[in-house]
From Swiss-Prot:
HAMAP family: Ribosomal_uL13. InterPro entries: Ribosomal_uL13, Ribosomal_uL13_bac-type, Ribosomal_uL13_CS, Ribosomal_uL13_sf. This is Large ribosomal subunit protein uL13. It holds the Pfam family Ribosomal_L13. Part of the 50S ribosomal subunit. It comes from the Bacteria. This protein is one of the early assembly proteins of the 50S ribosomal subunit, although it is not seen to bind rRNA by itself. It is important during the early stages of 50S assembly. The keyword Chloroplast does not apply. One of its GO terms (biological process) is translation. Keywords: Ribonucleoprotein, Ribosomal protein.
Length: 143
């Protein structure tokens, strides 16, 4: 018996919706990255995108434990000398909670072209409204 290798065009993709209300950011991001990679499937193949689509709702209600809201910084750089921009997570969660969740999930995906392809299947929304009802997403619960 030979080892099974998934083919990219033979993968059936489902849509899952995760409610982020009251969940720690790290646990939410870990589970979302697991689904995006396809590690929950028996047909997981590391070099093929076998993952499913993930919709995260209620991003503004995600929880950061400890003092991370005040101490953790979101950093980005313009590419120019002195171009480092720092934003505390408290301000980021007030203005753009979607970006905080996307940043956490992206850091848990592979840092290559395959990871970029997986990242395109992530959709994050501030509240419970999302435009993907036509895809009939299944609810995914995190303990």
């Amino acid at each position: 018996m030979s080892t099974f290798f998934a083919k990219a065009n033979a993968v059936e993709r489902k849509w899952y919706v995760i409610d982020a209300a009251g969940l720690p950011l790290g646990r939410l991001a870990t589970e979302a990255a697991r689904i995006l990679r396809g590690k929950h499937k028996p047909t997981f193949t590391p070099n093929v995108d076998t993952g499913d689509h993930v919709i995260i709702i209620n991003a503004e209600k995600v929880v950061l434990t400890g003092n991370k809201l005040d101490q953790k910084m979101y950093r980005r750089h313009s590419g120019y000398p002195g171009g480092l921009k720092e934003t505390p997570y408290r301000k980021l969660m007030q203005n753009m909670p979607e970006r905080a969740v996307e940043h956490a999930v992206k850091g848990m995906l592979p840092h290559n072209k395959l990871g970029a392809q997986m990242y395109t299947k992530l959709k994050v929304y501030r509240d419970e409204n999302h435009p993907h009802q036509a895809q009939q997403p299944e609810a995914w619960t995190i303990q």
